[in-house]
């Protein structure tokens, strides 16, 4: 599936009664909530002796993707453009791949 196709299909389940502002707020809160659920799965694996529940984690990652698509939609952006811009930023930051020295020397304004 193409990224923008996912965004379009995912947004068919968006509440149409929400304003653009409410969609953005909901998306950011949803990203935080679902990220917390993913963190909890990893925490239980890392610190509490549980097996890593990959199936559950994959479902939470899917929910995170949905809220990311919602945020992009609220901003009238498409995910493909966001992801391409992110890769371009990372290529400039780490042209030869990740480098600890370059990471440590990163300037504060390099977001």
Residue ranges and their predicted role:
Residues 1-61, 65-111:
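Flexible "arm" and connector segments at domain edges
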């Amino acid at each position: 599936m193409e990224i923008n196709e996912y965004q379009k299909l995912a947004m068919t389940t968006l509440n149409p009664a929400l304003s653009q502002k409410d969609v953005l707020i909901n998306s950011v809160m949803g990203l935080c909530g679902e990220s917390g659920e993913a963190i909890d799965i990893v925490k239980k694996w890392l610190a509490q002796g549980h097996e890593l529940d990959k199936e559950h984690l994959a479902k939470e990652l899917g929910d995170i993707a949905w809220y990311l698509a919602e945020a992009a939609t609220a901003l009238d952006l498409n995910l493909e453009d966001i992801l391409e811009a992110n890769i371009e930023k990372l290529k400039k930051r780490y042209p030869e791949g990740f480098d600890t020295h370059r990471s440590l020397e990163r300037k504060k304004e390099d977001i």
